[in-house]
C-alpha cells in the first residue's frame, strides 16, 4: 500500500481529499501520495503563519536559535530514514543523498549562529548611522526538486532566525522527505511558524500573488523566476530569486589530464547533472584537448548509471520525464 503523507499547517498534520502521486524516477513506480492543495489550504497556511508571526517576531533570538537547532537535531537523528527516502523520490545515489541530509542538518545549525546585531556604520559627534534588521512578516518559500531538503532548510532556517514565519512549497516531484521532516518537527517548533504545503505547479502563482505574503524566496529556473518577479510586482513583495546558472570550466595546458578528467566529469554529472552550478561549458587548451577528451571518456566508462538505491551506482536517473525530454 502506498504511504500517504500529510501537510503541516498551524502545527497540525493535515490532508486533503485529492492527492498527488509521487514516483520513484528509477523504477517509475508510485511510492507515495501527498495532498493536492489549492487556494483554501494556502489561505489556511498563510493565516496560521500570520497569527504565529505576532508572537514569533518578539520571541528572544536565543529561543529562535533553539528551535532551529531542534530541527537540525531531528534531521540528524533520523538521517538514515531520510536519505533513503530522498533517494527513492529524487533518484540520487545514497551517498549523495546522505550528503544532502547531513548537509541540511549542518546548514541549519550553522545558520542558527548568525548574528542579527545592529551594525553601526557611523558614530560621530554629529551623526549616528545604524542598520537594524527587523522581521519582514510571512515568507513564501518555493523549492526545486534537485536538492529538495537542502533548499527547504536554506529557506526555513533564515526565516525563523530573523523572526519571520514561513509557508513552504516543495516541488510536486520531490515532496516526501520534506513532509517527513515536517512530521518530525511538528512538536518542536511553535505552531504556525513553519507551514509546509504541497500541490501542483499551479499553487506557486497563488502564493506569489497572495495579499498576506510579504516576501518570496524561490530557487528554480530563470523562466519561472521572471514570472515570480512579475507577480510580486503588483504589491511590491520582497523577493529573493536563486536561478539557473551557466557555468564554465577552463582547462589550461599544464593540467594533468587524468586528474582533471575525473574532476570535470563530476562537475558536470553529479546528481545526473541536475545542479545549477554544474559545468555546462568546458574550454580545453588545444595542446591537451585530445588527451583530456579521451581521459574523460575512459573515466566515464567506470561510472555506473542506475538506481540510486543500488550499491555502486554513481549516477542516478534523470528526476522526471519533463526534465528527461
Residue positions per predicted region:
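N-terminal Rossmann-like NAD(P)+-binding subdomain of aldehyde/semialdehyde dehydrogenases
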Residues: 1-127, 315
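Residue-level signal for inorganic ion chemistry
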Residues: 28, 64, 86, 163, ...
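Rossmann-like NAD(P) dinucleotide-binding subdomain of oxidoreductase/dehydrogenase enzymes
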Residues: 119-259
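ALDH superfamily catalytic-core signature
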Residues: 223-325
Amino acid at each position: 500500500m502506498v504511504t500517504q503523507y500529510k501537510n503541516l499547517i498551524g502545527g497540525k498534520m493535515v490532508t486533503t481529499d485529492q492527492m498527488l502521486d509521487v514516483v520513484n524516477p528509477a523504477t517509475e513506480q508510485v511510492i507515495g501520495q501527498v495532498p493536492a492543495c489549492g487556494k483554501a489550504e494556502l489561505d489556511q497556511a498563510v493565516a496560521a503563519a500570520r497569527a504565529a508571526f505576532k508572537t514569533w517576531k518578539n520571541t528572544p533570538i536565543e529561543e529562535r536559535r533553539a528551535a532551529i537547532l531542534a530541527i537540525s537535531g531531528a534531521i540528524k537523528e533520523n538521517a538514515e530514514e531520510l536519505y533513503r527516502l530522498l533517494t527513492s523520490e529524487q533518484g540520487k545515489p545514497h551517498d549523495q543523498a546522505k550528503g544532502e541530509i547531513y548537509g541540511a542538518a549542518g546548514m541549519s545549525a550553522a545558520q542558527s549562529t548568525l548574528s542579527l546585531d545592529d551594525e553601526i556604520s557611523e558614530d560621530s559627534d554629529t551623526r549616528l548611522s545604524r542598520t537594524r534588521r527587523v522581521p519582514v512578516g510571512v515568507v513564501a518559500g518555493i523549492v526545486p526538486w534537485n536538492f529538495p531538503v537542502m533548499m527547504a532548510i536554506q529557506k526555513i532556517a533564515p526565516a525563523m532566525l530573523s523572526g519571520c514565519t514561513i509557508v513552504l512549497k516543495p516541488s510536486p516531484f520531490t515532496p516526501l522527505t520534506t513532509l517527513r521532516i515536517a512530521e518530525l518537527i511538528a512538536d518542536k517548533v511553535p505552531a504556525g511558524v513553519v507551514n509546509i504545503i504541497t500541490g501542483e505547479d499551479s499553487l506557486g502563482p497563488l502564493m506569489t500573488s497572495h495579499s498576506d505574503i510579504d516576501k518570496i524566496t524561490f530557487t528554480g529556473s530563470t523562466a519561472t523566476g521572471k514570472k515570480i518577479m512579475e507577480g510580486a510586482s503588483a504589491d511590491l513583495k520582497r523577493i529573493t530569486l536563486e536561478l539557473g546558472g551557466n557555468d564554465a570550466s577552463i582547462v589550461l595546458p599544464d593540467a594533468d589530464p587524468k586528474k582533471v578528467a575525473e574532476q570535470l566529469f563530476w562537475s558536470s554529472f553529479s546528481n545526473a547533472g541536475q545542479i545549477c552550478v554544474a559545468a555546462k561549458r568546458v574550454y580545453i587548451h588545444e595542446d591537451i584537448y585530445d588527451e583530456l577528451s579521451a581521459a574523460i571518456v575512459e573515466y566515464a566508462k567506470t561510472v555506473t548509471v542506475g538506481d540510486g538505491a543500488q550499491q555502486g551506482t554513481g549516477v542516478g536517473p534523470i528526476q522526471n520525464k519533463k526534465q528527461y525530454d
